[in-house]
Amino acid sequence: MQIIDLGCIPYAEAVEIQTGRVQEVAAGAENTLYLLEHPKVITFGRNGGRENLHVDDSTLASMGIEVAQTTRGGNITCHFPGQLVAYPVFRIAGRPGGMRALFYSLEEVVIRTLARFGLQAFRSEGRPGVWIENRKICSIGIAMRRWTSYHGLALNVCRDVSLFDMITLCGLTDARATSLQAECNDDSITLQEVKDVCAGEFRAVFAHPPVAAHQNSV
């Protein structure tokens, strides 16, 4: 696995990079993990989400917030500086469990990353992503083309998650967003620090995928 740090780039640019790499990985190139941030953008998944947006597009545009329809699974979510985004462009063909196992492994990466900061996070049946009690700290939405994954996860690191106030998070009225800094009550934790830990956990998890990922995918 090669890991590439893209810095903070627009959403559309990241999609273009991923789709280009999908073709290469599907043809035999090395699996690639992109780590990055996005400027403020609200995205909709294949399950919809515009009905869960509480602000019109013109108001968002005046605030410098983009809106984008995507090919990933899931509903509505937000991206912004201070949120760690990870896009795994990985071959799925031949992997035990396929996409469901990949999803489980992505959750595992985040759970282990948060544990390194002293936080106990968990999966919630029927509520994709990673949670701390009823607070969502990480959204996950993936897609597949030519048996290769793209899109991925978004882990809230910095305390300010106010962009989520403009949406019903993933269409769940009882859910609210949280962040690593807020849960640790420590604003000194940097995104780079979390990025480094997350990269290490990606390598560990995908070197030895969790058994439950295979069991849950059949």
Swiss-Prot record:
GO annotations of cellular component type: cytoplasm
Matches recorded under Gene3D superfamilies: Bira Bifunctional Protein, Domain 2
General function of this protein: Catalyzes the transfer of endogenously produced octanoic acid from octanoyl-acyl-carrier-protein onto the lipoyl domains of lipoate-dependent enzymes. Lipoyl-ACP can also act as a substrate although octanoyl-ACP is likely to be the physiological substrate.
Family note: Belongs to the LipB family.
Pathways involved: Protein modification; protein lipoylation via endogenous pathway; protein N(6)-(lipoyl)lysine from octanoyl-[acyl-carrier-protein]: step 1/2
EC number of this enzyme: 2.3.1.181
Compartments (UniProt record): Cytoplasm
Record GO biological process: protein modification process
KW Cytoplasm (keyword) present: yes
Protein's UniProt name: Octanoyltransferase
Record: residues binding substrate: R72, G73, G74, N75, I76, T77, C78, H79, S139, I140, G141, G152, L153, A154
SUPFAM superfamilies to which the protein is assigned, alphabetical: Class II aaRS and biotin synthetases
Keywords, sorted A to Z: Acyltransferase, Cytoplasm, Transferase
Site feature: Lowers pKa of active site Cys: K136
